[in-house]
Amino acid sequence: MAPKIKYTREEMIETGINIIKESGIENLTARSLAKRLSISTQPIFTCFGSMEEFQAEIYEYVEILFHEKTQAGLKANTPFLGYGKAYIQFAREEPELYRLLFIDNKKQGYLKVMKDAQDLIRPSLQKIYHIDAKSADFYYSNMWLVVHGIASLIVTECCPYTDKQIGEIMMGFSLSICQSIKTIPGFVDNNYDGYTLYKKMIGE
């Protein structure tokens, strides 16, 4: 007869996430989870089969949490700037969870997180900025580099910028990319003469 399980899967996942928040994914083991719950490791493997399965469910839960937090930023007047600020705020408030999603993930699950976020944001970008889907995806991928770079600096405690400066940096990049999409033919397809445009811009 199988032993009675004292904790539900959800409670084990919640406890696992708390361990990650406190000391990182590298310290989430069957033994550390069992110790926190004051149980043996057997109920954990009864519920999940393996730590790989357990960690996969934790990753999925954290991804959902990330999307919930960042999607709220789309309610701002400028959707991607609101999203970007929420993205950075998530990194600031939950650095270990951010590491789990985007830095320490060896299976490149962050690519799925990026794609899911892109799918969520695309309609808002098209509606607010009056651009087609391809241009919206181009805008997103370029702005993601900026936002992810800032968030990574914050998580690694290397960010030299104030919140005001971060907002100004994001606005500057956003305006530049959006303007280029709208005014430079072939920009989205990388089918334009950048060298000639630069010479014209600097007055040569």
Language-model-detected regions and their locations in the chain:
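Short, Lys/Arg-enriched anionic-surface-contact patches
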Residues: 1-8
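Alpha-helical structural segments
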Residues: 11-18, 53-75, 82, 86-89, ...
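Amphipathic alpha-helical packing segments from all-alpha helical-bundle domains
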Residues: 105-130, 137-145, 168-179
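C-terminal peripheral helix-coil segments that are non-catalytic and often amphipathic
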Residues: 123, 127, 156, 160-204
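Short linear capping/connector segments at secondary-structure termini
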Residues: 100-108, 159, 192-194
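Helical hydrophobic small-molecule/effector-binding pocket
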Residues: 80-103, 109-114, 144-147, 151
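Helix-turn-helix
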Residues: 11, 15, 19-53
